[in-house]
């Protein structure tokens, strides 16, 4: 859960959480939960999730297919 009482922005907390989960293998190559599901799970707004997903894309951890969702990329 993202903590709103910390000085670190919620989107950065979410990036850190999702990065740890991806690197730990919690999410294998394949689809991530929907934006709506991530909002509910982490108690954040849509814009926060979208910003976090953009940073994960920029880092090469995920890719997004229009109208399909975001996916964990294959890690070689």
Predicted regions and their residues:
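Minor-groove-contacting beta-hairpin "wing" of winged helix-turn-helix DNA-binding domains
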Residues: 68-74
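Extreme N-terminal segment that seeds HTH/winged-HTH DNA-binding domains in transcriptional regulators
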Residues: 1-63, 74-75
């Amino acid at each position: 859960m993202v903590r709103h009482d910390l000085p670190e922005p919620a989107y950065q907390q979410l990036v850190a959480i999702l990065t740890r989960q991806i690197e730990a293998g919690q999410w294998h190559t394949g689809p991530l939960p929907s934006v709506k599901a991530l909002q509910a799970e982490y108690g954040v707004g849509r814009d926060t999730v979208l910003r976090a997903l953009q940073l994960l894309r920029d880092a090469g951890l995920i890719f997004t297919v229009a109208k399909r969702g975001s996916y964990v990329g294959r890690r070689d």
